[in-house]
């Protein structure tokens, strides 16, 4: 969630997806 779409998605997937 640093502002970059890739990072946002990675953080989101890392929290819920994992």
UniProtKB/Swiss-Prot annotation:
Keywords: Allergen, Glycoprotein, Hydrolase, Protease, Serine protease. One of its GO terms (molecular function) is serine-type peptidase activity. Its EC number is 3.4.21.-. Glycosylated. GO terms for biological process: proteolysis. The keyword Hydrolase applies. Transmembrane segments: none annotated. InterPro entries: Lectin_legB_Mn/Ca_BS (IPR019825). Has a serine protease activity. This is Major allergen Epi p 1. The lineage of its organism: Eukaryota, Fungi, Dikarya, Ascomycota, Pezizomycotina.
